[in-house]
Amino acid sequence: MEAYDQKIAEEEAKAKEEEGVPDEEGWVKVTRRGRRPVLPRTEAASLRVLERERRKRSQKELLNYAWQHRESKMEHLAQLRKKFEEDKQRIELLRAQRKFRPY
């Protein structure tokens, strides 16, 4: 079994060396793996994804009618406008105090 494991490890190392290197005719061998490794699906990551999907689904379930969608969008836009005005006032205050340095 150890000999088999060693043989597999050697083959993987050889494949990794040859990956992306053109042969004598200029062809590049395409493998199953991508260039970047895929993030492993840990339990914490899968829980975060499930939580995000559940939150999104719960919001959609609450909004059954078109007018509810419109109202929620309008509320969201109102919140964004309010935050923008607050930020604008804060910047004006900093400019008045000559402490505003955007860069």
UniProtKB/Swiss-Prot annotation:
Coiled coil listed as a keyword: yes
GO BP term (any one): ribosomal small subunit assembly
The UniProt record lists the keyword Endoplasmic reticulum: no
Record keywords, A-Z: Coiled coil
Biased composition (Basic and acidic residues): 1-19
GO cellular component, as recorded: CURI complex; UTP-C complex
Coiled-coil boundaries: 71-100
Region (Disordered): 1-25
Protein family (similarity comment): Belongs to the RRP7 family.
Protein name: Putative ribosomal RNA-processing protein 7 homolog B
